Amino acid sequence: MQAATLSFHPSAPPPQTSACHFSSKQPNQLKYSLFSYTCPILKRSLLSTQTLSRKSICKPPAVATGKYVREDYLVKKVSAKDIQELIKGERNVPLIIDFYATWCGPCILMAQELEMLAVEYESNALIVKVDADDEYEFARDMQVRGLPTLYFISPDPNKDAIRTEGLIPIQMMRDIINNDL
């Protein structure tokens, strides 16, 4: 039994079904062209030493598909600085912070529920969202490990904030706002 040799072919196109395949001319020679493949979106090699943010690589789908977290509607997208000002300032209503990402499926579902909640609690709660990719360091400081992550912050500074992670039902959000804040 002969061992297959691994060879790199810079001019070979990327395989259609797998990352490697056997050459029909030389059945024991494995062609592996992943290392030479230039990504058409990034216009550079996939193994470049240059680093890019996840947001530049993972573009959100077109708005026409409907499956996209909108930048602003009723629940406003805010920065880390805006959140810090909201937390330090005096409020008469609870603050709900949604840490999300545009590529996150559960975040898209949660965004729809939060928009409904924003209509329902229009003057009784302040709901904002933070893009965890745009505000990576702030999300890390807030111990966001999974998405979506919600923080429910009471207007009473003596009450602890409530943190949830993952998709939660709208009724649970109502219960937290009505009973725990």
From Swiss-Prot:
This protein's GO CC annotations: chloroplast; thylakoid
Keyword Cytoplasm: no
Domain Thioredoxin: 71-181
Keyword vocabulary terms for this entry: Chloroplast, Disulfide bond, Electron transport, Oxidoreductase, Plastid, Redox-active center, Transit peptide, Transport
Chain segment of the transit peptide: 1-70
Gene Ontology process terms (BP): cell redox homeostasis; plastid organization
Disulfide bonds: 104-107
Residues with site note (Deprotonates C-terminal active site Cys): 98
Listed EC numbers: 1.8.-.-
Region Disordered: start-end pairs: 1-20
Broad class of the protein's primary localization: plastid
UniProt-annotated location(s): Plastid, Chloroplast
Site (Contributes to redox potential value): residue numbering on this chain: 105-106
Record's function text: Probable thiol-disulfide oxidoreductase that may play a role in proper chloroplast development.
Protein name as annotated: Thioredoxin-like protein CITRX1, chloroplastic
Organism in which the protein naturally occurs: Nicotiana benthamiana
Gene from which this protein is expressed: CITRX1
